[in-house]
Structure formats: structure tokens, C-alpha cells
Curated annotation (Swiss-Prot):
It comes from Streptococcus mutans serotype c (strain ATCC 700610 / UA159). Phosphate binds at R99, K223. GO terms for molecular function: aspartate-semialdehyde dehydrogenase activity; NAD binding; NADP binding; protein dimerization activity. Its EC number is 1.2.1.11. The keyword Oxidoreductase applies. HAMAP family: ASADH. Belongs to the aspartate-semialdehyde dehydrogenase family. This is Aspartate-semialdehyde dehydrogenase. The gene is asd. It comes from the Bacteria.
């Protein structure tokens, strides 16, 4: 007997990939319900070659649903996820809304699937840039410990949604085909739809993802810091991030510097990463082999390379980490959580509702 699975935000960049990942999943599924806003309700999508009409998301959409995958923005999750839990579903939320809620486990299945065991009806999927870094760092943390993490990201525009993809393609065409000066291209979305100014991304790099906080870091950077500490259950671990948007469509890349508690031999570090589930070692500088964003598109794995000792700090290590931000960074991690819920016997209704109905 299979599950009824709902996908909220089914027509978006992540939602469409959730459908694809669910089609390829080992999760036993009897029925899929596709939900969206009024703008997309009525569209017809396919699941395993069957037409499925997209329905409007309402408070009553979750009757009979076992698992609900949310990727329609934090406000949608805040409004509807508690109703899904009340109806008996387990929610896997791909937005930031519940990530720091102490009643909600924040899960990368390869790293901390056990955190789901006492769930209260909602499991949060971490930020895309956090997820791939966790896959790369966990095998090192397990063997040698971590005393510091510093990361600089090179993030694809798809992390800002389909509208950002469309804007980037338009801008590049205007520069290449029409000869428009890159500085003169009109922008409406990036670096953050919620901020006062917008800048072109074509032939540019924007050192801002999301809006700035009071401490001069962006919310994206603080997500990486706070989520890393929560997932690793190390609240005192020093973590800092600089997040940059670059003009590629898919796959995030990260330059990660860590300091380990115990000195870690580089060849042993490479072996630990190569053996870790979900990680692929691509590190052969003699043959110029290292992770590339273009090569990661469409893959579920996280690719790690350029692993090398710091020149001055004995326990310092640098690496390059790449993954498809819409798959492992979002859709696949969400479906993978659903698979883990099934495997661990955790697809169950929650007796006590701990989330506010709005």
C-alpha cells in the first residue's frame, strides 16, 4: 500500500523537480496531489505519464494526504503547513520558515536522519548552500572534529526562482545579441526581490543574496551559519559565510575552509569523503579533474575536490564543493527525507499540534 503525497508549489522551479524526483523515488506512492496558488491552479502537469490537474492550495487540501512536500515560499508554509499536520500529514518543508523552530528537525538524511525520529509533524529541509556543505564536511567532522568553518559561495540564479532564471537569460541576450552595456541592463529581481535596489546579474557577480541583517551579514549568510550549527548540534562552532550570486543558471559552488580539532591527513580526508553517502570525490589535479557546476546539473550527489592543506595553519583544509541546488539543494533532499521517513516508520499523524493555525 502506497502513500498519498501532496506537492505544494508544484509548478515552480523546485516543485517541478520534486515531481521528477518523486517519479524516480523508492517511496511507495499511490496518488499525487499537485497544489499551487490561484495563478497556477488549473494547469495540467504529468506524473508518471498521467495527467494531474494542479489544485488551489487551501486549508482543506490535505485530507487523506500522508506526506506533504512544501516549496512555495515561507508565507505559504506558515499558513498551510499546520493545517496539513492537523489533517494527519507529515510535512517536509523546503522553505526557511520552520528551520530554526526548536520543535522542527532540520535534516540532511546522510548527516542526521536520526533527528526525525521524534518529529512533531514537520521536518525542515535546510538551505541549498548549507546542504551541500554538510555532505562535504560531515565525514571530516566524524573523524577529526571541526573547530572553524569559513565558506564563500558562488550561487546560481535558480536559487532565486524561475523569475530570476528568466531575468538572467533576458539580460545575457540583451548584452550578447543587442550590444547593451552590461551596466545599463534593466533588473527587477536580483540581488533580492525584497530589497530597494536591483542590479543586473549578466556578466556580473553580486555579493548579496537576500537582504542584509543588522550585523551586516545577509540572511542567506546567516542561514548557513545558524543551520550548520543546528544540524551538527554544535552551537558554539564558529561558522561564517560570504554568499555571492553569479550568472550561471544551475548548481552552487563553494570555496570552503575548515580547521579540524585533530590534524587530518589529506589523503585520509579524501578517502573519508569518497566513502560518504551522497558525496563524490573529484580530485585529480594531475588530470585537471575537479568539480564543475555544469557537470553537476541533473545529479543528486555533492561533488568535492581541490582538497588541500592550508599553507600556514597545520589543521587548516581548503576544498571546493559543488552540487545541483535544485536537486540535492532542494527537491531531492526533500524527497530523500520522505524516503527516510518511510524507511524509519515515521510516516504517521501527530497527536499534539505544536504549530499555530492561522
Amino acid at each position: 500500500m502506497g502513500y498519498t503525497v501532496a506537492i505544494v508549489g508544484a509548478t515552480g522551479a523546485v516543485g517541478t523537480r520534486m515531481i521528477q524526483q518523486l517519479e524516480q523515488s523508492t517511496l511507495p506512492v499511490d496518488k499525487v496531489r499537485l497544489l499551487s496558488s490561484s495563478r497556477s491552479a488549473g494547469k495540467v502537469l504529468q506524473y508518471k505519464d498521467q495527467d494531474v490537474t494542479v489544485e488551489l492550495t487551501t486549508k482543506d487540501s490535505f485530507e487523506g494526504v500522508d506526506i506533504a512536500l512544501f516549496s512555495a515560499g515561507g508565507s505559504v508554509s506558515a499558513k498551510f503547513a499546520p493545517y496539513a499536520v492537523k489533517a494527519g500529514a507529515v510535512v517536509v518543508d523546503n522553505t526557511s520558515h520552520f528551520r530554526q523552530n526548536p520543535d522542527v528537525p532540520l535534516v540532511v538524511p546522510e548527516v542526521n536522519a536520526y533527528a526525525m525520529d521524534a518529529h512533531n509533524g514537520i521536518i525542515a529541509c535546510p538551505n541549498c548552500s548549507t546542504i551541500q556543505m554538510m555532505v562535504a564536511l560531515e565525514p571530516i567532522r566524524q573523524k577529526w572534529g571541526l573547530s572553524r568553518v569559513i565558506v564563500s559561495t558562488y550561487q546560481a540564479v535558480s536559487g532565486a526562482g524561475q523569475s530570476a532564471i528568466n531575468e538572467t537569460v533576458r539580460e545575457i541576450k540583451e548584452v550578447v545579441n543587442d550590444g547593451v552595456d552590461p551596466k545599463a541592463v534593466h533588473a527587477d529581481i536580483l540581488p533580492s526581490g525584497g530589497d530597494k535596489k536591483h542590479y543586473p546579474i549578466a556578466f556580473n557577480a553580486l555579493a548579496q543574496i537576500d537582504v542584509f541583517t543588522d550585523n551586516d551579514y545577509t540572511y542567506e549568510e546567516m542561514k548557513m551559519t545558524n543551520e550548520t550549527k543546528k544540524i551538527m548540534e554544535e552551537p558554539e562552532l564558529p561558522v561564517s559565510a560570504t554568499c555571492v550570486r553569479v550568472p550561471i543558471l544551475f548548481s552552487h559552488s563553494e570555496a570552503v575552509y575548515i580547521e579540524t580539532k585533530d590534524v587530518a591527513p589529506i589523503e585520509e580526508v579524501k578517502a573519508a569523503i569518497a566513502a560518504f553517502p551522497g558525496a563524490v570525490l573529484e580530485d585529480d589535479i594531475k588530470h585537471q579533474i575537479y568539480p564543475q557546476a555544469a557537470n553537476a546539473v541533473g545529479s543528486r550527489e555533492t561533488f568535492v575536490g581541490r582538497i588541500r592543506k592550508d599553507l600556514d595553519i597545520e589543521n587548516g583544509i581548503h576544498m571546493w564543493v559543488v552540487s545541483d541546488n535544485l536537486l540535492k539543494g532542494a527537491a531531492w533532499n526533500s524527497v530523500q527525507i520522505a524516503e527516510s521517513l518511510h524507511e524509519r516508520g515515521l510516516v504517521r499523524s501527530t497527536s499534539e499540534l505544536k504549530f499555530e493555525l492561522k
